[in-house]
Regions:
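ABC transporter nucleotide-binding domains
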Residues: 1-138
């Protein structure tokens, strides 16, 4: 029987920015999950929280941002049975750095500056993975 544990599960995520006038809520109670092998696109209006959600998943929130609720649970296929709450990791800690780029990656909002229109997305991803593998082996 195949493992049906979601690869990534976002539960009631709440992220905001504490300002002198009070808290500006950027993400308010967002929940979704991503199954193994799935490709997901976060789509929404400008200012809807897509980038903040992505930055939270990657552990790349700016210092002015704060996760004040929820969880981002990652079930690493390389560590069966282990679920890591990314929100609880130190953004600059060894565990987060090992996940970022190697296990979890994101293409941000401006695909024309991130991707080449002359090559398929699949080829570009394969090339990036090959370059990372080469760096690891060197």
């Amino acid at each position: 029987m195949a493992d049906r544990t979601p690869l990534l599960r976002i539960n009631d995520l709440r992220v905001g920015f504490d300002l002198p006038e009070g808290r500006l809520v950027a993400v308010d109670g967002v929940s979704f999950q991503i199954q193994r092998g799935a490709t997901v696109a976060l789509v929404g209006e400008s200012g809807s929280g897509k980038s903040v959600i992505s930055q939270t998943i990657m552990g790349l929130l700016p210092r002015s941002a704060k996760v004040f609720g929820g969880s981002v649970l990652f079930a690493d296929p390389n560590k069966p049975g282990t679920i890591t709450d990314i929100v609880r990791l130190s953004p600059n800690g060894a565990e987060m750095r090992s996940l970022r780029g190697g296990r979890i990656s994101i293409i941000f909002q401006e695909p024309m500056t991130s991707l080449s229109p002359l090559h398929t997305i699949g080829n570009q991803i394969r090339e990036a993975k090959g370059m990372k593998l080469k760096l690891l082996l060197d």
